[in-house]
Structure formats: C-alpha cells, structure tokens
Amino acid sequence: MSLDKQLKDIIDSDLHRYGYSSEGQMGFMTKRECYGYRYSKVLRKCKWYREHDKKILFLFERVKLRMLSEKLGFQITYSTQIGRGLYLGHMGSIVVNWKAVLGDNVNLA
C-alpha cells in the first residue's frame, strides 16, 4: 500500500465518523460547515508530512493548522498520537496534551 493511500485511508476513516463515505458525497457548503472534519484532515496531513520528511508540504499544512486552531479553538498538536476515526463534535475549546494517546473512534465533544 502506498504512503498516499495510507493517508487517504486514515482521513476517510475520520470522514466516516461524520456520516459520509466519501468527500464526493459532501456538498461544498457541507465541507465548509463541517469544522471538525476540516481540522482533523489538516491535522492528519500535517502529522503525515512531518513523519515522512516532506518539509515544504509540512510547513504549508502547519500554517493551515495554526489558522484553524485559532479560528475554532482547538489545541491538538500534530505530535499527539491519534487512532483512526477522530470525531470533533463542536467548535470551541478542545485541548489535548501532546503526550496523550487517543485510540480508534474517539469522540472529542
């Protein structure tokens, strides 16, 4: 399995928690309004690029992660270990320690 395929599978498992089987099912406005999924997607990409030495992509995603963190009130670092199926249920003040280990299908709401 290629690295990009693995990243896509992880992101799709997060998307499944929001009730969609693929991004194609989501309309444009749904993508804009689904803040938890937007944040988790950028978080996953940031972590992935950091671990696989893709520095330019990592820096780009890190800036996006920082902007979304400030906008939404989420403080979850890319170094936090998170299993598949992350669900962020609401906007505003969600803080996770960088040493935390979260399993599969975790709800943070």
Regions found by a protein language model. Give the residues of each.
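Beta-solenoid/beta-rich acyl/carboxylate-transfer cores
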Residues: 75-87, 91-107
